[in-house]
Swiss-Prot record:
Keywords: Ribonucleoprotein, Ribosomal protein, RNA-binding, rRNA-binding. Belongs to the universal ribosomal protein uL18 family. Part of the 50S ribosomal subunit; part of the 5S rRNA/L5/L18/L25 subcomplex. Contacts the 5S and 23S rRNAs. HAMAP family: Ribosomal_uL18_B (MF_01337_B). This is Large ribosomal subunit protein uL18. SUPFAM superfamilies: Translational machinery components. One of its GO terms (cellular component) is cytosolic large ribosomal subunit. It comes from Chlorobium phaeovibrioides (strain DSM 265 / 1930) (Prosthecochloris vibrioformis (strain DSM 265)). The keyword Ribonucleoprotein applies. Pfam families: Ribosomal_L18p. The gene is rplR.
Length: 119
């Protein structure tokens, strides 16, 4: 499968799931992005078009972590969950952004659940 086909396939999946998934201030959308070397996660309020919280493997508190392997993704998910709980957010809607729920995406979700987020 060529790179263009992969990108267009992911975009179609993303568009289809975005039609069904929306975040609010009470139950924001946990949106992830996985690049080859990093992982990013945001809590987004779609009704107000604002980002409530953002954590990535490039954050200042993650300087000692190298790459974006499964363990790094689990740590990023745990940090996101802890920061969300501190802001009073307990439930979220998970948006995998067209990526398969496997490997690093699953590790980030598991880390967020370990910290107490419900989805």
């Amino acid at each position: 499968m060529s790179q263009i086909d992969k990108a267009s396939r992911r975009q179609k999946i993303k568009d289809r799931s975005r039609a069904a998934v929306a975040g609010t201030a009470v139950k924001p959308r946990l949106c992830i992005y996985r690049s080859l070397s990093q992982i990013y996660a945001q809590l987004i309020d779609d009704s107000g078009s604002t980002t409530i919280l953002a954590v990535s493997s490039m954050s200042k508190e993650n300087k000692e972590l190298k790459g974006a392997g499964v363990e790094v993704c689990r740590t990023v998910g745990r940090q996101l969950g802890e920061k969300a709980m501190a802001k009073g957010i307990t439930t979220v809607v998970f948006d995998r952004n067209g990526f398969r729920y496997h490997g690093r995406v699953k590790a980030l979700a598991d880390g967020a659940r370990e910290a107490g987020l419900i989805f």
